[in-house]
Amino acid sequence: MGNACRGSFGGKTFQGYPQPQDHSESNSNPKHNSDSPKPKKEQQPLVTMNRTSTNQSYYVLGHKTPNIRDLYTLGRKLGQGQFGTTYLCTELSSGIDYACKSIAKRKLISKEDVEDVRREIQIMHHLAGHKNIVSIKGAYEDPLYVHIVMELCGGGELFDRIIQRGHYTERKAADLTKIIVGVVEACHSLGVMHRDLKPENFLLVNKDDDFSLKAIDFGLSVFFKPGQIFTDVVGSPYYVAPEVLLKHYGPEADVWTAGVILYILLSGVPPFWAETQQGIFDAVLKGHIDFDSDPWPLLSESAKDLIRKMLCMRPSERLTAHEVLCHPWICENGVAPDRALDPAVLSRLKHFSAMNKLKKMALRVIAESLSEEEIAGLKEMFKAMDTDNSGAITFDELKAGLRKYGSTLKDIEIRELMDAADVDNSGTIDYGEFIAATIHLNKLDREEHLMAAFQYFDKDGSGYITVDELQQACADHNITDVFFEDIIREVDQDNDGRIDYGEFVAMMQKGNPCIGRRTMRNSLNFSMRDAPGAH
C-alpha cells in the first residue's frame, strides 16, 4: 500500500489519562512467551473528537490555490484515514506519479483542527530535502477538501515487513534504527518534534529494499523551542513515552518511541503491553523491560545497553538522537564519529556564503515569493535566534546561537558567515536575509520560482539580464562593492556579455562553487535543542 493517511489527524489532543492506580504484576510485567501478542497497528486514535457539520467555504490554507485537477489526475485509493483519503495521482505536465492526501474540510470542526492541517504542511516544507522524509510537492484547496501532494512510496509499510519477518538480525535492525533515529535527529535539529513515530509511519519506496525508508505522517508533529514543555497527550499507546502520559514532555519523547521500535525490530513484540489500553499505559509508567524471554538471551549486550538508554524513564538522562547514532551498536564497525554532524541550518548557511551576489539576490526574491506554510519553520528559528526581538540577528546573537548548538566555529569563521548572509552590509541579518540564506535549495527545482526570479532582474523583459539591470537590482537591495562585470562573466556561458534564462537557471542549480568555504545555509543548520532565548 502507498502513502496511507491513517492516523495523520487521528491521534488528537485530549484531556489525558487517569493517573495510574496500583499496577498488578500481571499487567505491567508480562513475559513475552509464545502467547504474547504481536504489535498491532494503531488504527484508533487515543480519543475521538466530537464533530458536527459546518460551513466549508473558508480557506484552510489561508490563501487561494490552483485547482488540483488542472495539474493532476486523481487515480485509485491508496489508503483511508480518519480525516481523509490518500489517492494515487499523476502530474499532467510530467506524467510522474505522486500520492495525494485529500482531507475532508467538513471534518475540520475546530480552529485547532485547521491549525493542525496547516502545521503539517508547514512542517513537511520545513523538513524538505531529507532523504528519509517523504517530500511534499504542494498543497491545494477546493471547497470540500485540502489536498497534500507528496512523493509516492509504493513499497509498503515497515510494519508489514516486520510482521512478515518476525524480527530482524541485529545488523539489519541497527541499519534500520540508524535511519529512523536519523529522521528524529533531523527533525529535532530543525525544531520539530514528531510525536507519532511508529512502524506504520515509515514506508518503503521500493518493496525489494528494506532500507528505502521514508517517514510519513506529520499530522501530530509540532514546532518546539528548547526548554518548551508540552502537556497535550498524543501518540499511540504502544509507543508513547511515560512523560507524555504525565503531561510534561519535550523532544526526548521521540527517542523513547524510537527505542520501542528498536525493541520490536529485535524481538517482534512491544516492550510494554497488556490486554487493555490502560494496562499498556500502566506498563509504560512502570518501565520494566523484559530481557529474559526469547530471543533476548541470544542478543548482544550492546543492543540491550542501547535500548536501556533509549527507554530510560528520566528524559534528562535519556540519550539524544545524536548520541544514539554515536552508540557503538549503531555505528559502522562499532566506531562512533569523532564529531557531530553540522545541524541542518548550519550547513545551509555554509552553502549560502559561497554563492555570488546575483544568486543571493535571486534567493531573496524567491524567498519573498514563498507561501507562509513553506517558511513557517524558518520563521520560528529566526525568532529563537533574535533574542532581543529587534527583527535582526546581530553578530553576538549568531555567535551565541551557534555556540549553543555545539558549534566549534572560530569567531573569524562566524564573522564570515555573518558577512555572507548580510547581503546589504547593514551589520545584522534581517528576516528576509535569514530566510534567503536558509531556505532549502530544493526550491530551486521549481520552474515558477526560477522564472519569477529571472523576470525580477530582467526589468525590460528582453529575455536577458544586462550589466545595467544587475546594477539596478543591487541598488534596490542596497548592495555595494559589487563587480558587475565579474558576475556577468562568471555566469555568461556564451560570452555575449549578458545572462539569458538558461544561463541563469544553470547558475542557480549548480552546486557550491567554492568547496571548503563556509556558507550561510550550512551554518544556520543548527539544532533547535538549545536555541538561545527560547522559553
UniProtKB/Swiss-Prot annotation:
InterPro entries for this protein: CDPK_Ser/Thr_kinases, EF-hand-dom_pair, EF_Hand_1_Ca_BS, EF_hand_dom, Kinase-like_dom_sf, Prot_kinase_dom, Protein_kinase_ATP_BS, Ser/Thr_kinase_AS
UniProt-listed CDD domains: STKc_CAMK
A GO BP entry: intracellular signal transduction
Regulation of its function: Activated by calcium. Autophosphorylation may play an important role in the regulation of the kinase activity.
UniProt-annotated stretches for the region Disordered: 1-46
GO cellular component: cytoplasm; nucleus; plasma membrane
Keyword tags: ATP-binding, Calcium, Cell membrane, Kinase, Lipoprotein, Membrane, Metal-binding, Myristate, Nucleotide-binding, Palmitate, Phosphoprotein, Repeat, Serine/threonine-protein kinase, Transferase
Active site: D196 (proton acceptor)
Entry protein name: Calcium-dependent protein kinase 5
Species for this entry: Solanum tuberosum (Potato)
